[in-house]
């Protein structure tokens, strides 16, 4: 299994096939997990689960039951509240939610809407459906069970 990191965004999960026909699970990036960064693609994360199985005969090791579990790093801001030195609204109430449990009500108060003080980013829909669409496109739908 290869687990990459750093780009702050969910990246594809795929099987790579070696010269000898062996399969390796490759996860290019799981995202940030916990952050208060400002855009949808930076607050949707991947918790990947899988089983490492060693056969009784021959000791062959395989990776099975791979599942991608999207989570949202939720935070809130106060529209008229304090800002930091870069004029970003201060964030609070940071929590992780499984995307399957995330609601439109939570989307409506997510701090990404108010991240630049009074400026509201309108170019990116921040809805449960758009979070699912982004996650499936970024990670690949193969391992998303819902």
Where are these regions (language model features)?
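A short C-terminal boundary segment appended to hydrolase-like catalytic domains
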Residues: 43, 47-146
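Conserved beta-sheet core of the metallophosphoesterase superfamily
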Residues: 1-48
């Amino acid at each position: 299994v290869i687990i990459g990191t750093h780009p702050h965004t969910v990246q594809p999960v795929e099987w790579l096939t070696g010269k000898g026909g062996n399969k390796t699970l490759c996860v290019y990036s799981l995202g940030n997990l916990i952050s208060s960064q400002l855009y949808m693609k930076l607050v949707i994360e991947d918790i990947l689960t899988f089983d490492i199985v060693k056969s009784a005969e021959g000791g062959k090791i395989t990776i099975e039951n791979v599942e991608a579990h999207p989570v949202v790093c939720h935070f809130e801001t106060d529209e008229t509240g304090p800002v930091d030195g870069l004029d970003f609204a201060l964030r609070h109430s940071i929590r992780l939610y499984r995307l399957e449990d995330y609601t439109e009500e939570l989307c409506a108060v997510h701090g990404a809407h108010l991240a630049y003080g009074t400026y509201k980013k309108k170019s990116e829909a921040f809805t449960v459906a758009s979070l699912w669409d982004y996650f499936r496109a970024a990670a690949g739908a193969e391992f998303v069970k819902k």
